[in-house]
């Protein structure tokens, strides 16, 4: 459907052929000029109908196309929803208008690092056999790309000590960063006093909590 946009009147001699040049309108296809002879009663009318142009509209994020298409000028802009793990969407560059503009346009997503991305720390304790068993798991939050260090767990230092330095890493956008922290059992020396007798060994070294077999003392008389 067409609606009247503007009109203008001109004068010319009766029976002369006129061919007014159509105006150029942004976003519309310019029609070909029409010719007509001027009537003596002033009823001569030339109508120009402008069809809307179509333009290529593309939305991209991090080099990948989110959506693209060819859309009619002035119609509602089909703006897509963009998502990127570990980031907050801040809008499109350039800013998106409500309707399709009169030119081919590429819009690029603008992102900001999210500050609530999870990373995981798993704590392992050494058992009596010298193997490690998962004791607890903690979920922390950080900013995408942030360098973080695992927290130290408050175990009784009479029983356990850190095997190595606390690990560090970069918070992954997809929440995949996992720290594994190991605690060894403390080792203690155990002495045996035979009180004047003799034993096969006077000292043993053992992990906390492990079974220790005491030597049998021997004493003459």
Task: Indicate where each model-derived feature is located.
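Secondary-structure capping and domain/repeat boundary segments
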Residues: 1-221
């Amino acid at each position: 459907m067409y609606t009247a946009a503007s009109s203008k009147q001109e004068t010319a001699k009766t029976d002369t052929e006129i061919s007014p040049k159509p105006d150029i309108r942004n976003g519309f296809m310019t029609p070909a000029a029409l010719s007509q002879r001027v009537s003596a009663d002033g009823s001569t009318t030339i109508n120009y109908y402008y069809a809307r142009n179509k333009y290529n509209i593309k939305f991209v994020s991090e080099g990948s196309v989110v959506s693209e298409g060819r859309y009619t000028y002035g119609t509602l802009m089909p703006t897509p929803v963009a998502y990127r793990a570990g980031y907050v969407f801040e809008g499109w560059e350039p800013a998106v208008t409500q309707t399709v503009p009169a030119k081919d346009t590429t819009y690029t997503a603008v992102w900001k690092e999210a500050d609530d991305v999870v990373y995981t720390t798993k704590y392992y304790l050494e058992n009596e056999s010298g193997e490690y068993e998962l004791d607890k798991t903690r979920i922390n939050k950080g900013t995408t790309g942030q360098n973080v260090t695992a927290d130290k767990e408050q175990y009784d230092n009479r029983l356990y000590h850190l095997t190595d330095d606390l690990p560090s890493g970069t918070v992954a956008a997809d929440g995949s960063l996992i720290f594994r922290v190991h605690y060894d059992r403390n080792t203690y020396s155990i002495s045996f006093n035979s009180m004047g007798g003799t034993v096969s060994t006077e000292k043993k070294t053992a992990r906390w909590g492990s079974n220790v077999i005491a030597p049998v003392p021997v004493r003459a008389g």
